[in-house]
Amino acid sequence: MADQDPAGISPLQQMVASGTGAVVTSLFMTPLDVVKVRLQSQRPSMASELMPSSRLWSLSYTKLPSSLQSTGKCLLYCNGVLEPLYLCPNGARCATWFQDPTRFTGTMDAFVKIVRHEGTRTLWSGLPATLVMTVPATAIYFTAYDQLKAFLCGRALTSDLYAPMVAGALARLGTVTVISPLELMRTKLQAQHVSYRELGACVRTAVAQGGWRSLWLGWGPTALRDVPFSALYWFNYELVKSWLNGFRPKDQTSVGMSFVAGGISGTVAAVLTLPFDVVKTQRQVALGAMEAVRVNPLHVDSTWLLLRRIRAESGTKGLFAGFLPRIIKAAPSCAIMISTYEFGKSFFQRLNQDRLLGG
């Protein structure tokens, strides 16, 4: 087949193999992605500022409008932007306290509270949008990577050692640009659990306020996260896979080695790029907040300013919010994706060989 790459399969077959891997990976890993996004998108609790020794808190009625002060009752105040506030005329003497169930203290706490208060299906919220985005993005990305790597190595434009790094970075940069609007919508669905109708209204408002450019809100930190991630991932993957393949018989499939190599390289890349993932999530979730407070989306803080702000407000720990779910997700998702992709390529290689022999 003239249109086959050096691995013996066509670009279309590469896209089918990678798209299948994307579906399998999304079904298994979406719950961890939902938890990661929810952990990253929540603001630092005001409770820690008002009552450091307890997460149960209230505000003085003197700060409320007179119409609310006159009620003399405990009430829950929600303005749609900040966290819910429990307001009590008796202050600390009141026996009834409000504890915000949407505040998460960790990964397991997030899993338990999401299931308890929102239902198990919430763990797969945004899955349709995830599949709509992930399948074409992964098909484009993996196919572009293999084609670029073959191109770079075939024309000796770079050494075989660094070809995976360059090819991975270029492939991811193009994919991020094409898929960025869908990534924004998926993050919005997972972080605030809005309906598709509400999401559409939110997007229309953002476009009306800031133009079509607002749909690429978060492109900068997404690129800063994904391009280095891709470069690090493929560089380490090819190295680890090459090393592991030295321990297997020549007639043994390399899918198992790909699984291990993918998990290791994905973990390393995820740790090093996590701060940019936090910034990307907060910037994209801010789309709804901009609508609520009527902020012009064109005037957004730079990635570096957001990094400094997060560190000032939450410390270095804030830059690694969602660390555990991201790492827990990165290792198996990268392992599942690359091993499924390699299995698909092996399947098509055998299929093409059988066709040649049969023809």
Curated annotation (Swiss-Prot):
Solcar repeats lie at residues 9-151, 159-243, 253-347. Residues 36-121, 182-214, 280-317 are mitochondrial matrix. The chain crosses the membrane at residues 15-35, 122-142, 161-181, 215-235, 259-279, 318-338. [2Fe-2S] cluster binds at C74, C78, C88, C94. Residues 1-14, 143-160, 236-258, 339-359 are mitochondrial intermembrane. PROSITE patterns: SOLCAR. It catalyses: glutathione(in) = glutathione(out). One of its GO terms (cellular component) is mitochondrion. Its main location: mitochondrion. The activity of SLC25A39 is regulated by levels of mitochondrial glutathione via its ability to bind [2Fe-2S] iron-sulfur cluster. Upon physiological levels of mitochondrial glutathione, glutathione prevents iron-sulfur-binding to SLC25A39 promoting cleavage and degradation by AFG3L2. Upon depletion of mitochondrial glutathione, SLC25A39 binds iron-sulfur, preventing cleavage and degradation by AFG3L2. It comes from the Eukaryota. It is a multi-pass membrane protein. It is found in: Mitochondrion inner membrane. Pfam families: Mito_carr. GO terms for biological process: cellular response to iron ion; glutathione import into mitochondrion; heme biosynthetic process; import into the mitochondrion. GO terms for molecular function: 2 iron, 2 sulfur cluster binding; glutathione transmembrane transporter activity; metal ion binding. The keyword Mitochondrion applies. Gene3D superfamilies: Mitochondrial carrier domain (1.50.40.10). Keywords: 2Fe-2S, Heme biosynthesis, Iron, Iron-sulfur, Membrane, Metal-binding, Mitochondrion, Mitochondrion inner membrane, Repeat, Transmembrane, Transmembrane helix, Transport. Cleaved and degraded by AFG3L2; degradation by AFG3L2 is regulated by the ability of SLC25A39 to bind iron-sulfur. In absence of mitochondrial glutathione, SLC25A39 binds iron-sulfur, preventing cleavage and degradation by AFG3L2. The presence of mitochondrial glutathione prevents iron-sulfur-binding to SLC25A39, promoting cleavage and degradation by AFG3L2. Expressed in many tissues. Abundant in testis and kidney. Belongs to the mitochondrial carrier (TC 2.A.29) family. Mitochondrial transporter required for glutathione import into mitochondria. Glutathione, which plays key roles in oxidative metabolism, is produced exclusively in the cytosol and is imported in many organelles. Mitochondrial glutathione is required for the activity and stability of proteins containing iron-sulfur clusters, as well as erythropoiesis. This is Mitochondrial glutathione transporter SLC25A39. The gene is SLC25A39.
